[in-house]
């Protein structure tokens, strides 16, 4: 478990299919029991870490160490939740408390995405899976998201060329590979979005945190872009898809000129103007 303390989020894959040829360690298919077993292990590991930290911080907090006192208060807020089988991510923290929580690297403080590993027969409509609904309901109770992916089919899809892949998806009655949905859900979980730049024959995708303003997004490409930022010329990917060329987007009045306070949106296609 120590290997995942440094990660930003957890993707929890849960079996959600029946197959007599694939045995389950408990002899039955019960995704909620599987989830709770793992969550219990994570919670117990966190409780052990909190108790160890408490022993150190309590001594320091007896003096005039304000940081120790603040951390002690957070640890005392966390401990009873873990003892009751809860997750740290379900606790409301203010901004200062959250800084302390992040420094503790607790496993149950991390956002989680539940992935139901469904049968190939359920790909077209995951809601038909008798297990997926249970997983979604469980996730909703803790404010998490759940998606369905047929892992065995995804493995097969990954080995196909583009034409074969499209034929496979059409035969299964699905629009896109589950991997695409997994990537989007993971981006959403981490608060990440994408903008694009295009020049000559090269088009690049850049990842940014939701809420990033144009100058800071420009700085992802190069620090000079942020330092000398003048403006951003922006078109939405949906508009380019509709009008099919940059010239047509401009003619339709869909090309926008944005300043330093512009908050970037997912799918923006941008040309940054700068001077240094």
What residues fall within each predicted segment?
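Switch II of P-loop NTPase G domains
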Residues: 1-12, 16-36, 93-104, 128-131
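Charged, amphipathic alpha-helical oligomerization/scaffolding segments
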Residues: 6, 49, 74-77
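Short, exposed interaction patches on small structured surface elements
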Residues: 13-49, 143-157
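C-terminal-of-GTPase-core extension/linker across diverse P-loop GTPases
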Residues: 56-265, 270-276
């Amino acid at each position: 478990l120590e290997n995942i303390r440094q990660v930003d989020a957890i993707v929890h894959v849960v079996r959600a299919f029946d197959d007599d040829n694939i045995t389950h360690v408990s002899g039955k298919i019960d995704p909620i029991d599987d989830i709770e077993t793992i969550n219990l292990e994570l919670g117990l590991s966190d409780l052990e870490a909190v108790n160890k930290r408490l022993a150190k911080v309590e001594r320091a907090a007896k003096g005039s160490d304000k940081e120790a006192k603040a951390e002690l208060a957070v640890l005392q807020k966390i401990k009873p939740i873990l003892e009751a089988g809860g997750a740290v991510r379900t606790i409301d923290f203010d901004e200062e408390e959250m800084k302390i929580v992040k420094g503790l690297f607790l496993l149950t403080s991390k956002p989680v995405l539940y992935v139901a590993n469904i049968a190939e027969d359920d790909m077209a409509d995951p809601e038909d899976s008798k297990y997926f609904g249970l997983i979604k309901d469980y996730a909703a109770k803790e404010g998490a998201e759940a998606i369905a992916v047929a892992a065995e089919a995804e493995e097969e899809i990954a080995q196909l060329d583009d034409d074969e892949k499209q034929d496979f998806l059409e035969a299964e009655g699905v629009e896109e590979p589950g991997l695409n949905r997994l990537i989007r859900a993971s981006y959403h979980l981490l608060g990440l979005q994408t903008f694009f730049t295009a020049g000559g024959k090269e088009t690049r995708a850049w990842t940014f945190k939701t809420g990033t303003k144009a100058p800071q997004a420009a700085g992802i490409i190069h620090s000079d872009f942020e330092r000398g930022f003048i403006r951003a010329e922006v078109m939405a990917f949906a508009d380019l898809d509709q009008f099919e060329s940059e010239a047509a987007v401009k003619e339709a009045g869909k090309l926008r000129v944005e300043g330093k306070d512009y908050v970037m949106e997912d799918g923006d296609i941008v040309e940054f103007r700068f001077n240094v």
